[in-house]
């Protein structure tokens, strides 16, 4: 089970060039020195075909995915426009009350930061983003004085989280006061359940050089697990449930809106909760949910009109799951159009991906790739059959998005996304060749291609299209500068995806899987390979946090926050296997809580 449950919850380059592997795999592989281990083959899956080379060239896999969980369900869900209006009216009525709390001159810096943390937890902070940034900018200049005599673990941990989330790198030295003479965290801290939980959460915001955060994570996890597994506990039931949820998916391994949905339920059971803040959070969530339902209705109708699920029965029919792919980066109502664009783009790219993975022969994959390089089918071309359907669908959908965004002056982003797709198509073709021939490349060879198909630079580009609050050309200039943040995200996605899909990919003959390739190159078992990939995952999670922190002086926070949220989404999707392809179970539960059940206001 370790291989399929690891707790996960680039900039595309021509294949003729070597992607930036300074982070992984080479540096990590050198560090772990696995190549010096005696080579011993354990359970390596390698297809030995008796077919001729010509047969392999034209072989077609017989892969079909499970049908959609949702079908046309959301088309029958009624949305009352009057409810939309009333929710928005109530939110606007309450905003000044919450703002007054935030800006109160009677509140200390620590009290304001704790309130900011509560607003973030409840999913309401975006309403006051400018005010929050101003407060934190001012408070950070006098941080030493604020914390000099603070000995409350929860308070220090909250301040650490809030400052880091908003781009202020509060030093982890602040936690030295909670360590004993032996350098370890004091065992007496275990009695402070709230402080321990908060330290556990912020330990996920450590960077590469901050070993104390690794120690904090081990220390808090051990004690919190003991607390929840014991028969007797002094903690309240709602706190124990909150701890169990956090141990399963920590806050920064979960998407913002799911954190808010769970935290609202928890906060309502807290003694002395603030009624105004709770009601504001509930109204806000239900208002967001109305937006999500309307967006999914739009996507469902659009997808149904395309009729690709029946024309191309081998593809994944995942409109609601694709919306989750847009919701992860940004959940706020103002990004409604952005979520629709991201979801449409994901769905149409999945059509291409599934064609390469699950249906095309090698010659067909070659033809497909050639047309993607041209970004045009051409009137004189005699392309027929399903390949024409795939190509026309991709080009037409991206053309529709460009046409929609052009009046807003944002067609540049769409052109950039298409240019980047030329490169990812070449990588898809390489994976197709390996799969059809049953070839298991070395891990190093595989990652040169796999980091391209991870496509995090492309994913960021999808998000930029609908972000009207950023300068799209500047955002793509940063994206095209080979940022380390995107490199690390590519590694995270590739590892999470390959581990989460290992069993299903191997069962359908796709032996060029990162886990399988690692087993081959280093002669280790699946369990050993899983552990090493997990180390790479943790390492690159820290890189993401570090680059998020270090880039605020030159990259807009709205851009960086999307990237941080990508990593959180991977942890959700791949918590138990591949939640996108097989959403039945945990992902279905998450989607139901977000899209089906509103929060009762009383």
From Swiss-Prot:
GO CC aspect terms: cytoplasm
Motif (DDXXD motif): 353-357
UniProt family annotation: Belongs to the terpene synthase family. Tpsa subfamily.
GO molecular function terms listed in the Swiss-Prot or TrEMBL record: magnesium ion binding; terpene synthase activity
Name of this chain's protein: Terpenoid synthase 19
Keyword Cytoplasm: yes
Pathway: Secondary metabolite biosynthesis; terpenoid biosynthesis
Gene from which this protein is expressed: TPS19
Annotated localization: Cytoplasm
Tissue: Predominantly expressed in flowers and siliques but also in roots and leaves.
Domain statement: The Asp-Asp-Xaa-Xaa-Asp/Glu (DDXXD/E) motif is important for the catalytic activity, presumably through binding to Mg(2+).
SUPFAM superfamilies: Terpenoid cyclases/Protein prenyltransferases, Terpenoid synthases
Keywords from the UniProt entry: Cytoplasm, Lyase, Magnesium, Manganese, Metal-binding
Assigned EC number: 4.2.3.-
Binding-site residues for Mg(2+) 2, renumbered to this chain: 353, 357
InterPro entries: Isoprenoid_synthase_dom_sf, Terpene_cyclase-like_1_C, Terpene_cyclase_plant_C1, Terpene_synth_N, Terpene_synth_N_sf, Terpene_synthase-like, Terpene_synthase_metal-bd, Terpenoid_cyclase/PrenylTrfase
Pfam family, one: Terpene_synth
Cofactor note: Binds 3 Mg(2+) or Mn(2+) ions per subunit.
Chain residues that bind Mg(2+) 3: 497, 501, 505
Binding site for Mg(2+) 1: 353, 357
Main location: cytoplasm
Cofactors (names): Mg(2+); Mn(2+)
EC main group: lyase
Organism from which the protein derives: Arabidopsis thaliana (Mouse-ear cress)
Keyword DNA-binding: no
BP GO terms, sorted: diterpenoid biosynthetic process
Taxonomic path: Eukaryota, Viridiplantae, Streptophyta, Embryophyta, Tracheophyta
